[in-house]
Structures are given as structure tokens and as C-alpha cells.
From Swiss-Prot:
A Gene Ontology cellular-component term: extracellular region
Tissue: Expressed by the venom gland.
Protein name: Mipartoxin-3
Disulfide feature: C24-C41, C34-C59, C63-C71, C72-C77
Source species of the chain: Micrurus mipartitus
GO MF terms, alphabetically ordered: acetylcholine receptor inhibitor activity; ion channel regulator activity; toxin activity
Locations listed in the record: Secreted
TM helices/strands, residue ranges: none
Amino acid sequence: MKTLLLTLVVVTIVCLDLGNSLKCYDKLKKEVTCPEGMKFCHKDVLPATHGNSVLVMGCTYSCGLGPRNMCCSTDLCNK
């Protein structure tokens, strides 16, 4: 009985991911787990030459300012 209870506790901890790791999309739109301390996902559109733009996405420590910056704090919110 104790073994079953211990097994259930371990499974619960693994499933809940008590580390509270944030997940964001990177520039290739793949899911990545953010390192500890990075509490935000971001998506920045940077102007480039000839009317093109560069998309930068991923985890960040803080949110940038500007009309082309998007920052959020929930899993996979920077799509």
C-alpha cells in the first residue's frame, strides 16, 4: 500500500511539473522550455532592409518596449 501511494505521489509530481517551467516558441516556431529565471515569452519584429523584417521569438528575462514588441507570461503565448 505504501509503495502504491509513493508511486502516485511521484507520478503526480512529474505530471504537474512543479518547477513551473515556462514554455515559449522560438524563432523556428518550435516549443522550448525556458531556463530558470526567464519568466516571459517574447516576439519582436525588427525592421530590415528593403521592406523586409526579422522575427525574433523566445524566452526573456524582461519585456522590451516598442510598437513591434509582444511580451507575455503564459505557456506558448508568443505564437
